[in-house]
Amino acid sequence: GRNLVSALENIRDKKDTTRNIQVECVYQYDRKSTSGELMDYCKDADFVFNLAGVNRPKKQSEFMEGNYEFADTLLDALRKNNNRCPVMLASSIQAALMGRFAGSDYGKSKLAGEELFFKYGRSNGVNVLVYRFPNLFGKWCRPNYNSAVATFCHNIANGLPIQVNDRNTELELLYIDDLIDEMIAALEGREHRCEFEDTTA
């Protein structure tokens, strides 16, 4: 979320005047934040970006805890505050559970989060946006954590071995600045929607 927070702060601080929005506050909630802070943020928010998630757990059960249970807590806080602001969920192409992603525990947890968001939107008349991210690369991506490109570049630059599991696999990539542009467009109410084989993204 650092790239999004930086972009929003640049708009707030008038360093970026190219956008057709005003940003007064940027609330950041993470593992160190309190449930009281979450309630306060959910009372005042005009738009919620849920970028929380677990992608490198110690136990498989942590996928559901981080990718579903927090989403449920977040949506419940919005519901309790009667806040019907738009909500955006960062999901993954693995949620399709097709091809090389079939049976992915990570994908299952992301799909469960998507279904929760869509149900919340239908029940509460809220605009819900779900973005299924492919492999991201760019500023602040971390090797051996959240970016295959960062890992590849890090290993090459440091003379470390690289691993290619299947040379025939086409890797889907998204540059972080392009993603941030779309997220700001969504904040402005200019989101892009697409549908892929029984899936709306």
Can you name each region flagged by the protein language model?
Residues 33-73, 77-81, 94-101:
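NAD(P)H-binding glycine-rich loop region in Rossmannoid oxidoreductase-like domains
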Residues 72-114, 121-124, 128-131:
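Conserved Rossmann-fold NAD(P)-dependent oxidoreductase catalytic core, especially the SDR/UDP-sugar
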